[in-house]
Amino acid sequence: MIGDPRQLGNPSDITHPGDSGLSVLDFILGEKNTVPPNLGIFLSTTRRMRSEITPFISESFYDSRLNSHPITDKRSLKLEGNPLPHHSGIVLVEMEHQDNAQSSKEEIEVIAKLYSYFLTQKFIDEGIERDISADDILVVAPYNVQVNLIQKKLPEGNRTGTVDKFQGQEAPISILSMTSSDGDNAPRGINFLMDEARLNVAVSRAQCLSIILINKELFNVHINSINQFKLKNNFLKLKQKSSVIEVNKLNL
């Protein structure tokens, strides 16, 4: 058996009693994040994410067992007049909006400006420099309403979709729009919006730079269970591991 139970499973509309709906890997691992040596082999090296991105993913979802291959740091972005704090790693843009549920025009405007900027910049892969194209930027949102609005705002050929669409894919740059203003406005609740597997997949699509647009109030979301405590804690850890910039300080 080969797989990653820390990412999204196959969707199913069927209800199973007890644990009978678990995948084989989930059933074997139980509460464990990674497979122990006596049960299998954990592939501990990523050839996608630069070493600035991997620590958050590794510590949050893989028991700190995941490391970046040296080849990943041979990919870089050449950004002139960069409006962000860094050229690589995880950048968290703190947004300020209210009453947004399935769409956020504020986040769409920022995404459009970042997208236009990146299309004027360069990507370097093992010493070979080229222009950044639409294929080099993934834009991810939790809700189809936001996805559709972003697609209409960006140039034709943009790679915009939900997390489910992009699992298994990669790009030098990823931009995640969290969309909802707070937990109360999140249509499917924080169990969906802040889901561990979705966060893992969204951030880990990036080879060089992962950008997260998130409203400040989501860090203060009210929790009602131990599971929700874990979800909130992941985002607090994300903030700690990111370069944080307030949206009004972006020079776009």
Where are these regions (language model features)?
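Conserved helicase motor core of SF1/SF2 NTP-dependent helicases
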Residues: 1-252
